[in-house]
């Protein structure tokens, strides 16, 4: 796009966000910097991106009729999926029937909505290195898969996110519990799972890869630590060998070129020495990439907004996005039931080069990420410690 109108006028450039969490909120803010009219949709009211959008809608995005009705009503110029729980076949049909523009493409949204589509594309079509794996539907298939890939292994529903339904099976004593959890933790309820062989990796990274009008660009690699399959800390840059970085970029380019379109992709990789294995890819900003709010001249959200609008991202012809030095993020978690209230915010921000984002989640029921602390320092270890200290200073209460 080279022309932008005025929001809430007939000339407006309209973008529909399908998913309105904390990542969508940051994308909405970046889009509005260019005068884009942002419409936010999700399955619950007052989601974070809804709080900054021009207007919002609550609907079941897995309902094809409801999704079609929303798109027909809003007539967006761009549809930007921000979560996996969307009836992506509807997006594919609308792209084919009406030329509706889906970011990065409707096919990419469909392939990445579950682990099977993207794993088969990576391993079987593109022949990228991955862990050994089996897809299973029944307990018998599940047990046979464990025998084939070996123990330890990882069991995940094909449709889940943020570690829901995911288990690391370390002995045969874990077999029944891992299956039961996978059948209750997925987005679609009981159903198909992937059993993945365990890779003895040194570390795992997210390589934020931007496809844009000027080519493909890469952010510095992001290291991260997960617990129960969910992001807890991330840092940038992750030290790695030149050979491993080069191979990571080759794998990232292969998978993102195949998915096509413009936008930012979060490519997850396992690394051991100079060896690299593909794990997963998200065709949108990644939670581990929250660190880029302080680590880069353009955050992952700014890069995504610029790329999908056809604007320069500041690193043409395959260049690397400018990095601000060792940086880290630490997730803020709330447990229980109620509306989150934060205390000691000033104490959390006491140290220089420390920042905070509170997501505005309207409610916590069980376990939820409600914010993130961010820090820069002279080393990765110092930045991680500073982010942890800031997180520990905050008090989170849940009010009825």
UniProtKB/Swiss-Prot annotation:
Magnesium is among the record's keywords: yes
Q: Tell me which PROSITE patterns the record gives.
A: ATP_GRASP
- Class of the enzyme per the UniProt entry, highest EC level: ligase
Locate the residues binding N(1)-(5-phospho-beta-D-ribosyl)glycinamide. Answer: 22-23, 82, 287, 361, 368-369
Per the entry, what this protein does is:
Involved in the de novo purine biosynthesis. Catalyzes the transfer of formate to 5-phospho-ribosyl-glycinamide (GAR), producing 5-phospho-ribosyl-N-formylglycinamide (FGAR). Formate is provided by PurU via hydrolysis of 10-formyl-tetrahydrofolate.
- Extract the PANTHER family matched here: FORMATE-DEPENDENT PHOSPHORIBOSYLGLYCINAMIDE FORMYLTRANSFERASE
Please state which protein family the record places this protein in: Belongs to the PurK/PurT family.
What is the protein named?
A: Formate-dependent phosphoribosylglycinamide formyltransferase
Q: Which gene encodes it?
A: purT
């Amino acid at each position: 796009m080279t022309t932008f109108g005025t929001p809430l006028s007939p000339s407006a450039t309209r973008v529909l966000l399908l998913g309105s969490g904390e990542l969508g909120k940051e994308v909405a803010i970046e889009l509005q910097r260019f005068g884009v009219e942002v419409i936010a949709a999700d399955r619950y009211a007052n989601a974070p991106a809804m709080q900054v959008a021009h207007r919002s809608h609550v609907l079941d995005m897995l309902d094809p009729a409801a999704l079609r009705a929303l798109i027909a009503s809003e007539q967006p110029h761009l549809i930007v999926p921000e979560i996996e729980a969307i009836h992506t076949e509807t997006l594919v049909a609308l792209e084919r029937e009406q030329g509706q523009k889906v970011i990065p493409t409707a096919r990419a949204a469909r392939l990445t909505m579950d682990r099977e589509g993207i794993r088969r594309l990576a391993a079987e079509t593109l022949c990228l290195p991955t862990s050994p794996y089996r897809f299973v539907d029944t307990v018998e298939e599940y047990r046979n898969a464990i025998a084939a890939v070996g123990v330890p292994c990882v069991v995940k529903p094909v449709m889940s996110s943020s570690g829901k339904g995911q288990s690391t099976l370390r002995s045969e004593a874990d077999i029944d519990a891992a299956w039961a959890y996978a059948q209750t933790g997925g987005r679609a309820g009981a159903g198909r799972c992937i059993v993945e062989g365990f890779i003895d990796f040194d570390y795992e990274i997210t390589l934020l890869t931007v496809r844009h009008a000027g080519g493909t660009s890469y952010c510095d690699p992001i290291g991260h630590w997960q617990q129960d399959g969910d992001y807890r800390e991330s840092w940038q840059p992750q030290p790695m060998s030149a050979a491993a970085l080069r191979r990571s970029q080759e794998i990232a380019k292969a998978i993102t070129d195949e998915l096509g379109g413009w936008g930012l992709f979060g490519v997850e990789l396992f690394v051991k020495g100079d060896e690299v294995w593909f794990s997963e890819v998200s065709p949108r900003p990644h939670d581990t990439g929250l660190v880029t709010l302080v680590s880069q001249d353009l955050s992952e959200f700014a890069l995504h907004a610029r790329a999908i609008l056809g604007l320069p991202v500041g690193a043409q012809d395959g260049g690397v996005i400018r990095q601000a030095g060792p940086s880290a993020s630490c997730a803020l978690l709330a447990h229980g039931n109620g509306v989150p209230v934060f205390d000691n915010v000033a104490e959390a921000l006491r140290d220089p080069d420390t920042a905070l984002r509170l997501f505005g989640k309207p409610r916590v029921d069980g376990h939820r990420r409600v914010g993130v602390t961010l820090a820069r320092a002279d080393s990765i270890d110092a930045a991680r410690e500073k982010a942890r200290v800031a997180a520990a200073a905050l008090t989170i209460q849940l009010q009825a």
